[in-house]
From Swiss-Prot:
This is Large ribosomal subunit protein uL15. Part of the 50S ribosomal subunit. Residues 1-62 are annotated as: Disordered. Belongs to the universal ribosomal protein uL15 family. GO terms for biological process: translation. Pfam families: Ribosomal_L27A. Residues 30-39 have a biased composition (Basic residues). Keywords: Ribonucleoprotein, Ribosomal protein, RNA-binding, rRNA-binding. PROSITE patterns: RIBOSOMAL_L15.
Amino acid sequence: MDLNTLKPALGSVKQGKRIGRGPGSGHGKTATKGHKGQKARSGGSIKAGFEGGQMPLQRRLPKRGFTPLSRVEYAIVNLKQLDAFEANSSVDTESLVAMGLVKSTACAVKILGNGDLAKSLRVSASKFSQSAKDKILAAGGTVEETV
């Protein structure tokens, strides 16, 4: 087998449509554009959202709300996921990234109280729900909110 003898599998490569190449091709003369009209002309594309002069939908509908610039997006971690850590270990953003529970150290982390925690852990995160705080402290762990 040589590189020059390699061929794609049968039926895997579809031949391109060759338009405007004579009547025998089936796509000659009007080259799949039909007869006359704006879309048959060169440069005859219509802008996205254009409705023939009628007021377009995106201008007919009112503007609604706004996006706050100071919005903070939190990565959510539940207590049942923290159960994977060893007892008395320290849980922070770096360790959560290492375990694959959070994508990056740049994102803020919020710990929620879904599930139970049987181990004592030192947990530091951006935010905690009240139930998560209570369960971590009840298990003998410590809670530290980072900014």
